[in-house]
Amino acid sequence: MDHIELISSPLDITTLYTLLGDPGCGASSVFVGTTRDSFEGKKVLSLEYEAYEPMAIKEMKTICTDLRAKWPDLKHIVIYHRLGSVPVGEASVVIATSAPHRLSALESVSLAVDQLKTRVPIWKKELYEGDDPAQWKENKESLRPKHSQVTSNRFNFATCKIEKQNENISDKLVQIRVHDDELSKRVECFVRRKRMEINMLNVRDFTQNQSLPHVLNNEEAEVSCARTQGAVIKQEQSNCHLKVRRVNNKSGPQQMHLRPNYAQELNKLMGSSESSCDPSGQVQNDLANNRLRTIESYMGLSANNQSLLSRLKQVENRILLLESTSPEYNHFTNNLKQPDSEEPSPKRLKRKIYCAEELNNLLKSFKDETGS
């Protein structure tokens, strides 16, 4: 059994020792911590203990659990700690265990003392005789980080040197010419206005009753609240509760189906350039060079006595430029088919939509067929 307590009265060691009694135990180990009369040449009058009691009790119970996990044969565990003023010679802490064998009792008490000083949030202040001021004692065995370690990791702003700013700054580089107060005021106004816009949109999108007069008139009622009256309202022709708008581009190569005569009109405009690109008069011995000259003349490029690879690179750059800047380049890249040679588009199959009752009937018929 575990006996744990924080008390303000003196500790009675004899009474606590009776808590260890058990017929099956052959050994008991007791540790008693008392107040000594001196510390580093100073005469100590008393010690004062303070604790964060809920957390201290929790940690003491955890210590008991750890002891029983390591020594399962422990019968009783006693951890009593005194709070308040403890004069010289009186006990401040009692830790005791009982077990069938002495080794478990001795080792468990030693570990419990170390864990108590390391984990339990109990603080001690020493009161000295004379003019020496009282001093809170730092527990060097505590697992918690020391104040010096925390402060040492902080950033030292003194190491950052601020260079003198150049006063000869051009006015063109300064975008805001107001004081800090005016700038803060503008930022606050901007945030307030955006907050009002968001609140109004929330009322429009999430209000529970769209027919309310204050909603239709963009006015805020005294008893309305978007958080409490909000509801998910599915918009028409949309899979979500927010409004979705579809934009159709009425011009460009991707919208040619909206202009049936677009290809014919573009062919008429390009007819003159196509007829002028006749490579019959530019026959050369090198077939690759001949074909490249045809492409260059068609695209309006000049060879300028460059190498074959350089001319190919020039043609590629020209194609990339046309693709990025001219929508009508779709006439060159896409092989448009005549209306007579267009293949019929495959018909979309309409799938029948079954209701829940029809599905149940189908499943029932399948079960009957398999069962028969």
UniProtKB/Swiss-Prot annotation:
GO terms for biological process: chromatin remodeling; Mo-molybdopterin cofactor biosynthetic process. Pfam families: MoaE (PF02391). CDD domains: MoaE (cd00756). Substrate binds at residues 101-102, 117, 124-126. Pathway: Cofactor biosynthesis; molybdopterin biosynthesis. Its EC number is 2.8.1.12. InterPro entries: MoaE_sf, MOCS2B_euk, Mopterin_biosynth_MoaE. GO terms for cellular component: ATAC complex; cytosol; molybdopterin synthase complex; polytene chromosome. Catalytic subunit of the molybdopterin synthase complex, a complex that catalyzes the conversion of precursor Z into molybdopterin. Acts by mediating the incorporation of 2 sulfur atoms from thiocarboxylated Mocs2A into precursor Z to generate a dithiolene group. This is Molybdopterin synthase catalytic subunit. It comes from Drosophila willistoni.
